[in-house]
From Swiss-Prot:
Taxonomic classification: Archaea, Methanobacteriati, Methanobacteriota, Thermococci, Thermococcales
Alphabetical list of NCBIfam families matching this protein: uS2_euk_arch
Keywords, sorted A to Z: Ribonucleoprotein, Ribosomal protein
Highest taxon listed in the record's lineage: Archaea
A GO molecular function held by the record: structural constituent of ribosome
The gene coding this protein: rps2
Example GO BP: translation
SUPFAM superfamilies noted in UniProt: Ribosomal protein S2 (SSF52313)
A Pfam family reported for this protein in Swiss-Prot or TrEMBL: Ribosomal_S2
Protein name in the entry: Small ribosomal subunit protein uS2
Record bears the keyword Ribosomal protein: yes
A GO CC term attached to the entry: small ribosomal subunit
Amino acid sequence: MADEYLVPLDQYLAAGVHIGTQQKTKDMKKFIYRVRQDGLYVLDVRKTDERLKVAGKFLARFDPQSILAVSVRLYGQKPVKKFGEVTGARAIPGRFLPGTMTNPAVKNFFEPDVIIITDPRADHQAMKEAIEIGIPIVALVDTENLLSYVDLAIPTNNKGRKALALIYWILAREILYNRGEISSREEFKIPVEEFEMKIVRR
């Protein structure tokens, strides 16, 4: 059914996908559900869910190896790495070396056909190079992000450990489903925990 969520609403909320920041840009206004008394902006999970469906269909059209997912943010590094393993996409967790997409002399030079950015602000170098080579940009965007040059925005908490794991897990499942590699979403047996950055307590 078109009006069903990709995962139960409670799962989105438990992962904190809806939790924004205390800053809001004009660009993100359409994705904001409400503002809490403490000044925290809350994202509209229905719109997150809708955009994940669109992104899954869009990304499924690309050759898996021509997709690049990046995350400088610590909590996004395990999710993009696992996303790459599951979908066949290229992943760059951690520091993005300048020239990776623009300078053939760089050791791991790679020119993707589409890029997934975990946070346009933190991943500014990858964003800049994607703009330079003119490829579509799919970005996870929080309440304080700008949408300039973003072709497909997925509104979400793009800093939280559980939120990032869930978003990349859903995206991986949607891509496989839309490619026809699984015939139903229930066939996707990889637990969401495998996408989650583990916290090592000393």
